[in-house]
């Protein structure tokens, strides 16, 4: 399946472009054994013209036939190539980026390839319950591997100390697995799912404006 790239996508997001769009499908909690609970998930990756992807994942518990039973969770965050930010980049806060992006050509992006011919990436993901994760990892073609570098927990949050996530595009479907270290346990299977693309990515020009 060809990857549709919005015409206004900033060059440094091209390695991540296969994630763009809306994805939906079924998953299983834990190891996926017979007693593991089922869930439905809707994931959206979008771009607003800046050098990161916005990420939202909504999940619902379901019965074995896929009928939604009740909301399960929501998480959201930002994904980007991992590089040192400079004067052309926006932030912190509301400091605007330059009109001309830091990386303007495919050659600029190619210089960021790592020793495995992929790209280093970072993702920040926030959960309900006072938990925020900072991931570092790599993307190589349609495969992503992420590991937490830091987990921030609020005073009342449950124990959650580390996580890994893997994503892959297989025959047009998005496969993912999430392992976590929580409640005093070491890393173990937490959830996995297979999602199908249900909506193509929008360009920044198509997104609603005030």
Curated annotation (Swiss-Prot):
The UniProt keywords, alphabetically, are: Heme, Iron, Isomerase, Metal-binding
Question: Where does the motif GXWXGXG lie?
Answer: 21-27
Say if the entry is tagged with keyword Iron: yes
For this protein, the record's InterPro entries field holds: Calycin, Nb(III)_bact/plant, Nitrobindin, THAP4-like_heme-bd
Q: Name one GO molecular function term.
A: metal ion binding
**Which Gene3D superfamilies does the record cross-reference, listed alphabetically?**
2.40.128.20
Q: What is its EC number?
A: 5.99.-.-
Alphabetical list of Pfam families matching this protein: THAP4_heme-bd (PF08768)
The superkingdom of the source organism is: Bacteria
Q: How is the cofactor bound?
A: Binds 1 heme b group per subunit, that coordinates a highly solvent-exposed Fe(III) atom.
Keyword Cytoplasm, does the record have it?
Answer: no
- Its annotated pathway? Nitrogen metabolism
Residues bound to heme b: 190
As its record notes, the protein acts as a catalyst of: peroxynitrite = nitrate
Give the required cofactors: heme b
Under the subunit heading, UniProt states: Homodimer.
Q: What is known of its domains?
A: Forms a 10-stranded antiparallel beta-barrel structure able to accommodate a hydrophobic ligand in its interior. In fact, this fold hosts the heme group, which is located in a wide surface cleft.
Its family remark reads: Belongs to the nitrobindin family.
The UniProt entry, under PANTHER family, shows: PEROXYNITRITE ISOMERASE THAP4, THAP4 PROTEIN
What this chain does, per the record? Heme-binding protein able to scavenge peroxynitrite and to protect free L-tyrosine against peroxynitrite-mediated nitration, by acting as a peroxynitrite isomerase that converts peroxynitrite to nitrate. Therefore, this protein likely plays a role in peroxynitrite sensing and in the detoxification of reactive nitrogen and oxygen species (RNS and ROS, respectively). Is able to bind nitric oxide (NO) in vitro, but may act as a sensor of peroxynitrite levels in vivo.
Protein name, as recorded: Peroxynitrite isomerase
**UniProt organism field:** Renibacterium salmoninarum (strain ATCC 33209 / DSM 20767 / JCM 11484 / NBRC 15589 / NCIMB 2235)
């Amino acid at each position: 399946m060809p990857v549709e790239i919005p015409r206004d996508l900033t060059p440094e997001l091209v390695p991540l472009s296969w994630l763009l769009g809306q994805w939906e499908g079924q998953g299983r909690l834990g190891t996926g054994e017979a007693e593991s609970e089922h869930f439905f998930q809707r994931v959206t990756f979008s771009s607003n013209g800046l050098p990161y992807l916005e990420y939202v994942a909504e999940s619902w518990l379901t019965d074995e036939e896929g009928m939604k039973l009740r909301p399960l969770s929501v998480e959201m965050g930002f994904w980007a190539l991992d590089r040192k930010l400079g004067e052309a980049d926006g932030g912190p806060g509301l400091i605007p980026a330059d009109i001309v992006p830091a990386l303007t050509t495919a050659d600029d992006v190619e210089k960021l390839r790592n020793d495995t011919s992929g790209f280093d990436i970072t993702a920040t993901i926030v959960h309900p319950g006072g938990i925020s994760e900072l991931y570092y990892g790599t993307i190589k073609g349609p495969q992503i591997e992420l590991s937490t570098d830091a987990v921030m927990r609020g005073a009342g949050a449950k124990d959650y100390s580390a996580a890994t996530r893997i994503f892959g595009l297989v025959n047009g479907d998005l496969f993912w697995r999430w392992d976590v270290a929580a409640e005093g346990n070491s890393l173990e299977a937490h959830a996995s799912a297979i999602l199908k693309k249900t909506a193509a990515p929008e360009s920044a020009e198509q997104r609603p404006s005030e």
